[in-house]
Design a protein with these regions (language model features):
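Flavin-dependent oxidoreductase catalytic cores
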Residues: 21-401
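N-terminal amphipathic/basic-hydrophobic helices that include classical n-h-c signal peptides
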Residues: 1-25
Length: 401
């Protein structure tokens, strides 16, 4: 069987640029690759997935999470842990874990030890939700952002997870310039705690309409000071945080996740290609572990542009000089093709890892994939979390509610 690889850069008719056998494509996805000095045996990455299972009220990782990550660890495989808040004020999602207390570090230590016992690797994703939050989650302080946008908290489509269920975000305020150094310091402290917790590296969450993204994109950043206006100014916070994180870990144990032209959480920019081209160029100077790129065909956990090719990874491939992790709506065949074509070095899967704990094995051996149940993505208990089995013929049904 021969498979055509299509060049999405071409205007007009799509151009077939190469022909690879099915076996050649699969072999590329399952060839070794190094991330810094970490030697991975395959290129199937577990994407960061918020699952709302940490212990309340202190956002502490628990034994349920240990089992979940143990099930999904693989020899030489990379797991990027779920979005993890850097401070109480950074919180924005009920029962999402943190990395700002000793109890949280102790909880994460159990998880990283379990992943390492299976000879896998794990990065912590560091997260500040910014305006995408509610005072009942932050514990009192109003959410902060690059600028104030009342349309955001008045939009009935914008919802955040709280003790009272899914509600509209609280009104937010603009971060004062004197406060920004404290935000950067919180990222650095969380990076230190990630090292104490046994992670192999850290990823900055700079996508999906959270705080760093709110500074990057001019639909949300209306500032007139040194952190607003030009692309260079809007990218300043991102680069300061990367500086802080690399000062703890070294450059080759830090990754950055971006979402070019992403619309989740009300995001927009007047020239996203220019913005993210600049970001990728600036990140080149660090020599990072990887750049993690979410395709714009995905909005949150929904594919909104079915059939659209991986355009973001494709155009940034020519700009970013390090490893690229592509994410967002990939199927097994398209994941294999994007690596074979060279537009990405690794592919991150989210929803398929929810329902297929042994996903790398299934992809390599071409085994059937289990369906996932969206109704149990954020249910605070074991249902739809640790009850999806590894592959067994005839045992591929969605777990019962």
């Amino acid at each position: 069987v021969r498979i055509d690889l299509v060049d999405f850069r071409s205007s007009g008719a799509l151009q077939v640029v190469s022909h690879l056998s099915f076996e050649e494509i699969v072999s590329k996805l399952f060839t070794p690759i190094s991330i810094g000095n970490l030697k991975l045996t395959h290129r199937v990455v577990m994407a960061p997935l918020t699952r709302s299972r940490a212990d309340l009220p202190d956002d502490v990782p628990n034994d349920l999470m240990v089992e979940y990550y143990t099930q999904r660890a693989s020899k030489g495989g990379l797991i990027i842990g779920e979005a993890t808040t850097i401070s109480p004020g950074a919180r924005g999602w009920l029962a999402a874990p943190g990395l700002y207390s000793d109890k949280q570090v102790a909880g994460w230590k159990k998880i990283t030890a379990a992943v390492h016992a299976k000879k896998g690797f794990m990065f912590a994703q560091l997260w500040h939700t910014g305006r995408a939050s509610h005072v009942s989650v932050t514990g009192g302080p109003e959410p902060v952002s690059a600028s104030v946008n009342p349309d955001y908290w008045n939009d009935p489509d914008k919802l955040t997870s709280t003790p009272s269920g899914w509600v509209q975000p609280s009104p937010h305020r603009e971060l004062q310039i004197a406060e920004i150094a404290g935000i950067v310091a919180d990222y650095r402290k969380a990076a230190v705690r990630a090292k104490q917790a046994g992670f192999d590296g850290v990823e900055l969450h700079a996508a999906n309409g959270y705080l760093i993204d709110q500074f990057l994109q001019n639909g949300s950043n209306k500032r007139t000071d040194e952190y607003g206006g030009s692309i260079e100014n809007r990218a300043k916070l991102l680069l300061e945080v990367v500086d802080a994180m690399t000062s703890v870990w070294g450059v080759d144990r830090v990754g950055v996740r971006i979402g070019p032209d992403g619309k989740w959480n009300g995001m927009s920019d007047s020239d996203p290609k220019a913005l993210f081209t600049y970001v990728a160029k600036q990140l080149n100077r660090f020599g990072l572990a990887y750049l993690h790129i979410i395709e714009p065909r995905v909005k949150g956990n929904v594919v909104v542009a079915e059939g659209q090719g991986p355009i973001a990874a494709e155009y940034l491939r020519a700009i970013f000089k390090g490893k690229i992790v592509a994410a967002g709506g990939f199927e097994p065949d398209t994941a294999e093709a994007v690596v074979a074509k060279g537009d990405a070095d690794l592919v991150a899967f989210g929803r398929y890892f929810v329902s297929n704990p042994d996903l790398p094995t299934r992809l390599e051996q071409r085994l059937p994939l289990s369906d996932y149940d969206r109704n149990t993505f954020y249910t605070f208990d074991a249902r739809g979390y640790i009850d999806y089995p590894a592959y067994m013929a005839g045992a591929l049904a969605v777990p019962s509610a």
